[in-house]
UniProtKB/Swiss-Prot annotation:
Superkingdom of origin: Eukaryota
This protein's name: F-box/LRR-repeat protein 19
Function: Substrate-recognition component of the SCF (SKP1-CUL1-F-box protein)-type E3 ubiquitin ligase complex that plays a role in different processes including cell migration, cell proliferation or cytoskeletal reorganization. Mediates RHOA ubiquitination and degradation in a ERK2-dependent manner. Induces RAC1 and RAC3 degradation by the proteasome system and thereby regulates TGFB1-induced E-cadherin down-regulation and cell migration. Also mediates ubiquitination and degradation of IL-33-induced receptor IL1RL1 and subsequently blocks IL-33-mediated apoptosis.
InterPro entries xref list: F-box_dom, JHDM1_Histone_Demethylase, Leu-rich_rpt_Cys-con_subtyp, LRR_dom_sf, Zinc_finger_PHD-type_CS, Znf_CXXC, Znf_FYVE_PHD, Znf_PHD
Record note on quaternary structure: Directly interacts with SKP1 and CUL1. Interacts with RNF20.
Biased composition (Basic residues): 226-240
Compartments where found: Cytoplasm; Nucleus
Length: 694
């Protein structure tokens, strides 16, 4: 149940993994430790997979090997919740915030998980004296417990923190959300109002050393938020803080008096920013000047004055400009210089009406990756290393499926339970399996692993029939590819264009493809899939197929390789083409004669636009089909008349001619053609059906 804050190598809160359970964390309910679950309400949880990220391309449903076992990048939950089995480590009970009404009572009875020690407790069960805790408002039931805060323990990457998370669109960005600070000390009186006069005298902000600041953690841009009080066994006060900084008690909520939440006292804060400098050389900022416009403020106590000095020191440290800020930030700063001159300039420079240069020597970086800054006039030159650079973005993967490594060779013998091998070799078993049907082969695949591998042999699956299935699942497509059939029937199925393209690119030995009854949207995948071994193509009764669609299918691919002089069409090697029920015209037949010259069987039945001129095109002296046609089906073509029957005598190899259901053809004319058909007479087993024995 424990949770770790995402580090530098993780993408967001969805990557929160369960840490290994230590002996110190054992307690009531500590054995049921699980990772956080989806909230099922955010934008990432309710959307579907994108199909483009490297996790989606690895999934089996998208044609990948399925080895990563990760969800889509765009479906990573942005606010994962604790599992329903989570219980308090101290009392062993689950969250009971639904049993009370008040906000304070709800907080005391809700489960909170620490991002440092991973312990899940009720805040009301903690018996801590004066302690502080920071609540993360981004992730539900997440905080830094008072115990870890009191001991000074920090997470692995406090600079990035749990607030850095990936947005709903899948891009990683800096979250501008804020957390809650929990303290049990009595509240301080409200601070004096913000002065509109010049800032207190002191060294310029850009001449004072300080750690580099990321522009996405500029907490000064957030509006001040009032405190919230929580009443329980002891009085607690929650103060809104932004990102990685907490508001100093007694400081101005509207001002930029922010300091890192792990700083314990001013000496530690200044010494961490000035390594190697003795305390007597630390330059302390001067007290603020009184403003003529502001109201009179009573003299603060010594402790309050010390806090004010500490606040102003941290303010100056935080305002050291970041050299990695973009030019757009500098432009926006220059545009708003008229309104923020008294806030962003040092007192001396504000009076002179000028701003320090951006490229001054106080901001330049040395070649060693260290920044040199003079804290004051005549002071020593200080330097410290820059902060760690953000991790580089992962390289964009190529948009193709990564195929799994080649499988190990299949065993030649069948191992038995006794340890010996079966006397029959693999070749003998395959001869036995060839007499079984698809259903019996599937039963044999469940017997043992060896038989399962043997039954995938493509010689056992010459033809696969998936017709009349509403949807094709990824396991079905993977099974087809593993068996490598020579004939595949997908008629009247809901196969999509993406699925068909995925199949055809992996079935290079496919000889027969049946797509009758499918939509043109899916059949259009034939225009981009190479089928060198295809001999039969069935496109009967496909919806919305006209001359333009057939032209797209018949024309040669536009991406011919350089140096290739011959432009072959996609159906150059097809011997049997079935186009029944399509709206074909004579223009489509001309394309067919040009780009499918090896047709021996052609089905044009129930094509409403086929008539006598179409038969003249098929049997013309320039037609390549005149010498190759063996089977011709023109049943249901109502525009055919008796005048086209003598044209069929031009086809010497014609063995079957189907003219059934042609209304304008007389049975007598068909009988005369059957009696005088070259090179021998036809026989008529049915009316208007002419057959010739080979």
């Amino acid at each position: 149940m424990g949770m770790k804050v995402p580090g530098k190598g993780e993408s967001g809160p969805s990557a929160l993994l369960t840490p290994p359970m230590s002996s110190s964390s054992r307690g009531p309910g500590a054995g049921a430790r699980r990772r956080r679950t989806r909230c099922r309400r955010c934008r990432a949880c309710v959307r579907t997979e994108c199909g483009d990220c490297h996790f989606c391309r690895d999934m089996k449903k998208f044609g990948g090997p399925g080895r990563m076992k990760q969800s889509c990048l765009l479906r990573q939950c942005t606010a994962p919740v604790l599992p329903h089995t989570a219980v308090c480590l101290l009392c062993g009970e689950a969250g009971k915030e639904d049993t009370v009404e008040g906000e304070e009572e709800k907080f005391g009875l809700s489960l909170m998980e620490c991002t440092i020690c991973n312990e899940i407790v009720h805040p009301g069960c903690l018996k801590m004296g004066k302690a502080e805790g920071v609540i993360n408002a981004e992730i539900p039931n997440c905080w830094e417990c008072p115990r870890c805060t009191q001991e000074g323990r920090t997470s692995k990457d406090s600079g990035e923190g749990p607030g850095r998370r990936r947005a709903d669109n899948g891009e990683e960005g800096a979250s501008l959300g804020s957390g809650w600070k929990l303290t049990e000390e009595p509240p301080l009186p409200p601070p004096p109002p913000r002065r509109k006069g010049p800032l207190p005298a002191g060294p310029p902000p850009e001449d004072v050393p300080g750690p580099p600041k990321r522009k996405e953690r500029e907490a000064g841009n957030e509006p001040p938020t009032p405190r919230k009080k929580v009443k329980g066994g002891r009085e607690r006060h929650l103060k809104k803080v932004g990102g990685d900084a907490c508001l100093l008690r007694g400081s101005d909520p509207g001002g930029p008096g922010l300091l890192p939440p792990r700083v314990l006292n001013p000496s530690q804060a200044f010494s961490s920013c000035h390594p190697g400098l003795p305390p007597e050389n630390w330059e302390k900022p001067k007290p603020p000047l009184a403003s003529a416009e502001g109201p009179a403020v009573p003299s603060p106590s010594p402790q309050r004055e010390k806090l004010e000095r500490f606040k102003r020191m941290c303010q100056l440290l935080e305002r050291v400009p970041d050299t990695s800020s973009s030019s757009s930030d500098s432009d926006s700063d220059s545009d708003s210089s008229g309104t923020s001159l008294s806030e962003d300039e040092a007192p001396g420079e504000a009076r002179n009406g000028r701003r320090p240069a951006r490229g001054s020597s106080g901001e330049k970086e040395n070649r060693g990756g260290r920044r040199a800054v003079r804290p004051g006039s005549g002071g020593p030159l200080l330097s410290w290393p820059l902060g760690p650079a953000p991790p580089p973005r992962p390289p964009q993967l190529e948009r193709h499926v990564v195929r799994p490594p080649p499988r190990s060779p299949e065993p030649d013998t069948l191992p038995l339970a006794a340890g010996s091998d079966h006397p029959l070799p693999r070749a003998a078993w395959l001869r036995v399996f060839q007499h079984l049907g698809p259903r019996e082969l599937c039963i044999c695949m469940r017997v043992c692993r060896t038989w399962s591998r043997w039954c995938y042999d493509k010689r056992l699956w010459p033809r696969m029939d998936l017709s009349r299935r509403k949807s094709l699942t990824p396991p079905m497509l993977s099974g087809v590819v593993r068996r490598q059939p020579r004939a595949l029937d997908l008629s009247w199925t809901g196969v999509s264009k993406k699925q068909l393209m995925w199949l055809l690119n992996r079935l290079q030995g496919l000889q027969e493809l049946v797509l009758s009854g499918c939509s043109w949207l899916s059949v259009s995948a034939l225009g981009s899939a190479p089928l060198p071994a295809l001999r039969l193509l069935d496109l009967r009764w496909i919806e919305d197929v006209k001359d333009s669609q057939l032209r797209e299918l018949l024309l040669p691919p536009p991406d011919t390789k350089p140096g290739q002089t011959e432009s072959r069409g996609r159906l150059q090697g097809v011997a049997e083409l079935r186009l029944a029920g399509l709206e074909l015209t004579d223009a489509s037949l001309r394309l067919l004669l040009r780009h499918a010259p090896q047709l021996s069987a052609l089905d044009l039945s129930h094509c409403a636009h086929v008539g006598d001129p179409s038969v003249h095109l098929l049997t013309a002296p320039t037609s390549p089909l005149r010498e190759t046609l063996v089977h011709l089906n023109l049943a249901g073509c109502h525009r055919l008349t008796d005048h086209c029957l003598p044209l069929f005598r031009r086809c010497p190899r014609l063995r079957r001619l189907d003219l059934r259901s042609c209304r304008q053809l007389s049975p007598e004319a068909c009988a005369r053609l059957a009696a005088a058909g070259p090179p021998g007479p036809f026989r008529c087993p049915e009316e208007k059906l002419l057959l010739k024995d080979s």
